[in-house]
Structure formats: C-alpha cells, structure tokens
Amino acid sequence: MQLEKELSRRKIKELLLEILSIYTPSGEEERAKDFFEKVSKEFNLNLEISKSKSYFLGKGDILLASHIDTVPGFIQPKIEGEVIYGRGAVDAKGPLIAMLLATYILNEKGYKVQFAALADEEGKSKGARELANSGIRYNYIIIGEPSNTLDVIVEYRGVLHLDILCRGNSQHSSSSKENLIVDLSKKILEIYREPSNYENFSIVPTIIKSGDYINMTPSEGYLHLDIRYSIKNSKDEILALIHNEFKTCDIKIVEDIEPVKVDVNSNIVKAVMRGIIKQGYKPKLARKAGTSDMNILKNIAKEIVTYGPGNSTLEHTNNEKISIDEIFIALTTYINAIEELCLKKK
C-alpha cells in the first residue's frame, strides 16, 4: 500500500509539472493535444477530442470532469519540496490530474469511468455546453474544482450578464439641458446591489462607456451588469427590476446560467464525504458564490457534486500553488467514492 502511494505521488508530480508547462488559456486548449495523446496510450484509455477542444478518456456512466483552460498569464512551473507552483495549479490542473489518475486506476480495477478535460470553463463554458447538448447522460458526475481539499460543494449561484444600450440627445456642453451620463448614473445607483451575503442577489456594473467629444453630451451610453443570485432568488423579479429602471433602453441578456443546489443526502454527496472520512479527515458541505460547469451539467446527470484539491483563495492569483498531499487526498477520495457508488449499483 505504501509503495502504491509513493508511485501515485511520483506520477502526480510528473504529470502536473508537465501539464503546467503547457500554457492553455481559454481558446488555446489545443496545445494540450500531445499531452492527452501520450496519456491515452500510456493508460490504455481511448481518447476523443471534441469540436470545442475538450478531451475525453475512457467510457462509462460515471464522469470525472475538470477543465483544461486557465485564466491568462503564464507562470513558470516550479517545485519547492512537496509544493508545485504554476498557472492552473489550483484552478484547475491540480484537480484535473487527480481525476485523470483516478480514472486510470478505477478502469484498471474494472470500473467504467470517463474522464473529461473540458474547454473554456473560464470563458463561456463551451466544453460544458457542448457536452450538455450532446445527448449523453450520466448516472453520476463529479466536477473537479478546488474546494480546499476537504469541502464538498453542493451549491453555486447563478449569473446573468446584461448589455444595456441607452440613447439621448447630444447637446453642446455649455448649454445642455440633458445629459445621458447623469441619467445613467442615477439609474445605476437605483439598481445597484452590493455583494453582501450568499442569499442576497447582487447587481454590479462592470463596464460603462459613453461620449465621444469633450464638449458634447453623449447620444449613446453602454452599460454592462453582472448579476449573481442564489436558488432562493427569482430571476424574473431581478430582470423586472432592471427593465423597470431602464424602460427606454435596449437590454440584451448575453449570458444566463441558472443556480444549482443538490440534495445533500444524495448518494454521490455521501460517497464523496465518506471518501474523505475513510482517510481520517473531516469533510464539510460548502457552497460557492460564483458559477462552475456544475451549473451547466446538472441536467445531464442523475446526481452531481463538485469536489477537488487546492486552496480556492489562490485561484487566478500569481501565487497559484498546490501540494502533492492535497492532490493525493483528492485522488483517493475520487476512488473511494466511485467504488462505493459502483457497489451500490450491484
């Protein structure tokens, strides 16, 4: 058993350093093709590459899914002791490697498990959307995102991204009676909802553009709103609030991702929790204020949950790092959980 652990840890180090050396920001996932072709041969798992440049290994009605893309900004991989640094070490190449090795080990044991390295999670989630529209269905899906190694994520908020275009009369600034910038500012203050607690929805302006001339009031103003809301909030009521304030403006929904909340008593949540407990650690249920591919893939699985190694506060930072211990705990958790789920099916 100790030998198996040491072999797994060496493989974690080898594969993670290799994948971190491949820069794969959203839209450039094809750079990882050689890596997955090599792993496919080494692990004897069939490789499929989708149109979105997502990578699938193996077949089965249980899916371990993480994402191969990262936010921009390459960080040269390095290792200090048992800690590995690099862009994506936490989000989400650390979880991805844990899932990749778990898929190999489980298939070697005779379990039919599929692995997915999805594209564009940091963008518009093209990989997850493609999979959701493919017609494929799974009994269980575990999403690999950093969850502090011991947290099991059962809830994510939803998101709305709105483009708003307002029009007014352009006048000389020395004698203007109308000012679209002032009007827009008043409207923003009326609808602004500062992020506070999880249950309360937030409405945050992130882009505002207006005006072309230093001595003329603008004829057009553009505003982008980022709205986050929980399962307890009404999307229709939020949109009604926006439409009521911007009655004369054009409003376009450019992204709409529903919130997700899973049953904490589901088989998959319990299996992941027990998978952690078996190693002598204490797991806890958690929820995240953002969104993930779990929001999109919830409808193609009978049961779904998010779990993975890594300190989530390090996501997207220039200090992304993860320990081999964290990845090994997650790897073991995936194996424990899926073995339990497969035994329940028999």
From Swiss-Prot:
Tagged with keyword Ribosomal protein: no
Location of the protein in the cell: Cytoplasm
Metabolic or biological pathway: Amino-acid biosynthesis; L-lysine biosynthesis via AAA pathway; L-lysine from L-alpha-aminoadipate (Thermus route): step 5/5; Amino-acid biosynthesis; L-arginine biosynthesis
Residues reported in the UniProt entry to bind Zn(2+) 1: H67, D91, E145
Domain of life where this protein originates: Archaea
Cofactors (names): Zn(2+); Co(2+)
InterPro entries: ArgE/DapE_CS, Bact_exopeptidase_dim_dom, LysK, Peptidase_M20, Peptidase_M20_dimer, Peptidase_M20A
Root EC class: hydrolase
Record note on cofactor: Binds 2 Zn(2+) or Co(2+) ions per subunit.
Catalysed reactions listed for this entry: [amino-group carrier protein]-C-terminal-gamma-(L-lysyl)-L-glutamate + H2O = [amino-group carrier protein]-C-terminal-L-glutamate + L-lysine; [amino-group carrier protein]-C-terminal-gamma-(L-ornithyl)-L-glutamate + H2O = [amino-group carrier protein]-C-terminal-L-glutamate + L-ornithine
MF (Gene Ontology): cobalt ion binding; hydrolase activity, acting on carbon-nitrogen (but not peptide) bonds, in linear amides; zinc ion binding
Active site as annotated: D69, E121 (proton acceptor)
Keyword flag Coiled coil: no
Gene3D superfamilies with a match to the protein in the record: 3.30.70.360, Zn peptidases
Family: Belongs to the peptidase M20A family. LysK subfamily.
Identification of the protein by name: [LysW]-lysine/[LysW]-ornithine hydrolase
Lineage: Archaea, Thermoproteota, Thermoprotei, Sulfolobales, Sulfolobaceae
